[in-house]
């Protein structure tokens, strides 16, 4: 949609969460290793809300407790410890993580805290075994430069990452504690972003600065973006868990569409004098003989069917608020999250799903549903049905007031779904088990004297020093292999840097697309490949096959891989001899086509010599020998 975002008063702020690539976790000596093998054990917990010192209970925490969920935590004996399981106090903060936080703060022009105090931030979804996350305020009031102008950075915090979610059931959530405690930077911007494109550019720039340090983890799940979005007459919506940079634009666009649509629905409902009836009616007896599979299944499991009446809502529940999502979807999200039900039916979409027209007529009569009214029904266990319908009643009332402030989950299609209300602001408490950290001027001076080269500077240098074209230089600057590239290019000056860069950026990706596990490759393997190339043990055409050989035989050395693959570097004399044989074997074609036989002969030469001789040598030798025959 082409909106006038300035007229709409769009304001967007980002929260970037980036894992740091440290040797140990933030509060213990466990490695920062994510595992997918079978865990060694599990524990179960139930978290309950408690009053603050002021006598208040956080509304998000209270809401979470109403779900009556238990939390299951998987652990490993050799890479996790009692700190993650909240059975041992936290150790001192990892110094490496603090140094990286100060470095990033300097690169973003932040004002540093004199002293870093570890705080406890309430976490209500079970993703931390203790019920809170340890976090440290490091710096404030900085900015980043973008093509759209400067964007303020409110704060940078150093905190522990949450558990990794494994499974989400109706009455339980299963986590693994291997990710819990990995150092994480939380970078929060001011709401200075005024368009979707600007939002994407801001996130890209922050990511660029983080990667420039060389001290952050790479790959899916290592960086997560939360996006706060609002427009005039709307509400602040926090969208959690945007993992793909390219999705940020669409998330912002679709949330603007959603808020505009919900405001239009509100105006229409007010015109109609719409009313939400609080009464929940039992319609189990009315639909006991239904052929609807969903309703029959609920009744078979000793469930009930109940319904509510929404006066003036006819046609509104089925109205689209985001691409493919309707007001009814908003109601359904609330019912699913707060009631634990699978979904709901509403009369805007009936008859359907096995519910007949006759049953709809009976339902409307029973509920006293007029022409402009709508009915919502839910089938499940009695307590779940009532929780779900009460949640829908609340959401329906909100639709006549405006847009509720919510935390929503980012979906893969650029839409969002309900997670929970926005949490209260005062969720931070001092951590009494970890001493404070004093930030001295000497420490800051050391950080300032060791800042990394920024990507834009590195790009110019790569083009000038290594003669990479601009596109390849851009890829290399942003690559996980950037340090390895520089090391190999300096170590093996005989090899063109372009070949090293394309191998690291293109060849490895092509091999991965073929289904081979490039993860088993080490820097030592790649060093052996280019060492062999520089010593003329192999040709550059052999590089992909040699890399595949290392993937298939990671314990072998280069000579062993070359032997397995049947590759060795031939002398010029050997190449000339083989090419002469190929020409003689195809002499009738040579006599008929002359130099026009070059293409056919080149193909046959490469089939026999690929991997054993340089392609350029093969080409020049063939041309020379063919001319001799033709003349």
UniProtKB/Swiss-Prot annotation:
The keyword Ligase applies. GO terms for biological process: glutaminyl-tRNAGln biosynthesis via transamidation; translation. SUPFAM superfamilies: GAD domain-like, GatB/YqeY motif, Glutamine synthetase/guanido kinase. The keyword Nucleotide-binding applies. It catalyses: L-glutamyl-tRNA(Gln) + L-glutamine + ATP + H2O = L-glutaminyl-tRNA(Gln) + L-glutamate + ADP + phosphate + H(+). It comes from the Archaea. One of its GO terms (cellular component) is cytoplasm. One of its GO terms (molecular function) is glutaminyl-tRNA synthase (glutamine-hydrolyzing) activity. Keywords: ATP-binding, Ligase, Nucleotide-binding, Protein biosynthesis. Coiled coil: none annotated. Heterodimer of GatD and GatE. Allows the formation of correctly charged Gln-tRNA(Gln) through the transamidation of misacylated Glu-tRNA(Gln) in organisms which lack glutaminyl-tRNA synthetase. The reaction takes place in the presence of glutamine and ATP through an activated gamma-phospho-Glu-tRNA(Gln). The GatDE system is specific for glutamate and does not act on aspartate. Belongs to the GatB/GatE family. GatE subfamily. This is Glutamyl-tRNA(Gln) amidotransferase subunit E. It comes from Methanococcus maripaludis (strain C7 / ATCC BAA-1331).
């Amino acid at each position: 949609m082409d909106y006038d975002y300035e007229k709409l008063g769009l304001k967007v702020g980002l929260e970037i969460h980036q894992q740091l690539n440290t040797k140990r976790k933030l509060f213990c000596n466990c490695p920062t290793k994510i595992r997918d093998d079978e865990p060694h054990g599990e524990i179960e917990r139930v978290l309950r809300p408690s009053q603050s010192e002021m006598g208040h209970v956080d509304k998000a925490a209270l809401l979470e407790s109403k779900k009556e969920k238990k939390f299951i935590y998987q652990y490993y004996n050799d890479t996790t410890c009692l700190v993650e399981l909240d059975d041992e106090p936290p150790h001192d903060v990892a110094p490496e993580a603090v140094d990286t936080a100060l470095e990033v703060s300097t690169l973003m022009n932040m004002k540093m805290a004199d002293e870093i105090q570890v705080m406890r931030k309430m976490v209500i979804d079970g993703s931390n075994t203790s019920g809170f996350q340890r976090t440290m305020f490091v710096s404030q009031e900085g900015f980043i430069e973008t093509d759209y102008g400067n964007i303020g950075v409110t704060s940078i915090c150093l905190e522990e990452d949450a558990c990794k979610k494994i499974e989400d059931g109706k009455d339980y959530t299963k986590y693994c504690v291997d990710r819990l405690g990995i150092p994480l930077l939380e970078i929060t911007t001011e709401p200075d972003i005024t368009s979707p494109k600007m939002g994407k550019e801001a996130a890209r720039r922050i990511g660029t600065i983080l990667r420039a340090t060389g001290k952050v983890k790479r790959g899916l799940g290592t960086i997560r973006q939360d996006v706060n979005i609002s427009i005039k007459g709307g509400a602040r919506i926090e969208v959690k868990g945007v993992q793909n940079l390219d999705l940020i634009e669409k998330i912002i666009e679709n949330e603007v569409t959603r808020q505009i649509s919900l405001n239009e629905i509100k105006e229409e409902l007010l015109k109609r004098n719409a009313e939400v009836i609080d009464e929940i009616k039992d319609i189990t007896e009315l639909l006991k003989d239904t052929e609807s599979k969903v309703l029959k299944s609920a009744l078979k499991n000793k469930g009930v069917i109940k319904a509510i009446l929404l006066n003036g809502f006819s046609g509104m529940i089925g109205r689209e608020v985001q691409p493919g999502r309707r007001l009814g979807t908003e109601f359904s999200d609330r019912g699913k999250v707060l009631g634990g039900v699978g979904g709901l039916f509403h009369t805007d979409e009936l008859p359907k799903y096995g519910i007949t027209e006759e049953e709809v007529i009976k339902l409307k009569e029973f509920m006293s549903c007029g022409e402009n009214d709508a009915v919502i029904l839910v089938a499940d266990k009695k307590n779940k049905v009532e929780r779900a319908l009460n949640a829908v009643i609340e959401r329906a009332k909100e639709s006549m007031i405006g847009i509720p402030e919510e935390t929503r989950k980012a979906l893969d299609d650029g839409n969002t779904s309900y997670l929970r209300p926005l949490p209260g602001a005062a969720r931070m408490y001092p951590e009494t088990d970890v001493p404070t950290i004093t930030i001295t001027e000497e420490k800051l001076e050391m950080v300032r004297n060791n800042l990394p080269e920024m990507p834009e500077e590195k790009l110019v240098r790569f083009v000038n020093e290594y003669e990479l074209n601009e596109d390849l230089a851009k890829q290399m600057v942003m690559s996980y292999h950037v340090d390895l590239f520089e090391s190999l290019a300096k170590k093996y000056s005989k090899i063109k840097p372009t070949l090293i860069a394309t191998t690291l950026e293109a060849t490895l990706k092509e091999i991965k697309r073929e289904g081979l596990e490039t993860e088993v490759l080490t820097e030592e393997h790649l060093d052996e490949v280019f060492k062999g190339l520089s010593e003329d043990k192999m040709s550059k055409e052999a590089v992909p096959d040699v890399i595949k050989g290392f993937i298939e035989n990671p314990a072998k050395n280069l000579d062993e891989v070359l032997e397995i693959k049947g590759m060795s570097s031939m002398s010029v004399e050997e190449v000339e001899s083989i090419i002469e044989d190929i020409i003689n074997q195809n002499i009738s074609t040579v006599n008929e086509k002359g130099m026009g036989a070059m293409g056919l002969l080149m193909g046959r030469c490469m089939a026999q010599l690929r991997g054993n001789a340089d392609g350029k040598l093969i080409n020049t030798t063939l041309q020379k020998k063919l001319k001799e025959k033709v003349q």
